[in-house]
Amino acid sequence: MSGKLKITQVRSLVGRNEKHRRIVRALGLKRMHMTVEHTNNPAIMGMVKKIPHLVTVEEV
């Protein structure tokens, strides 16, 4: 697990439960179509796996 991940929010948080909202905010995403880069590690991958319906992930 090396390299970086490009994570983009593609779905809105309206109507989502609080746990999913907190995960998205913890990743640093604040609005739709916003993109952030994180290192590829187990903590980040665990967060992404809980909200695959809200984000897209690409390796950089």
UniProtKB/Swiss-Prot annotation:
Q: Out of the domains of life, which is the source?
A: Bacteria
InterPro entries attached to this UniProt entry: Ribo_uL30_ferredoxin-like_sf (IPR036919), Ribosomal_uL30_bac-type (IPR005996), Ribosomal_uL30_ferredoxin-like (IPR016082)
MF term (GO), any: structural constituent of ribosome
**What keywords would UniProt list here?**
Ribonucleoprotein, Ribosomal protein
One GO term of the biological process aspect: translation
Q: How does it assemble?
A: Part of the 50S ribosomal subunit.
The entry assigns this protein to a family as follows: Belongs to the universal ribosomal protein uL30 family.
Q: Which HAMAP family match?
A: Ribosomal_uL30_B (MF_01371_B)
Q: What name has this protein been given in UniProt?
A: Large ribosomal subunit protein uL30
Give the organism, scientific name.
Answer: Desulforapulum autotrophicum (strain ATCC 43914 / DSM 3382 / VKM B-1955 / HRM2)
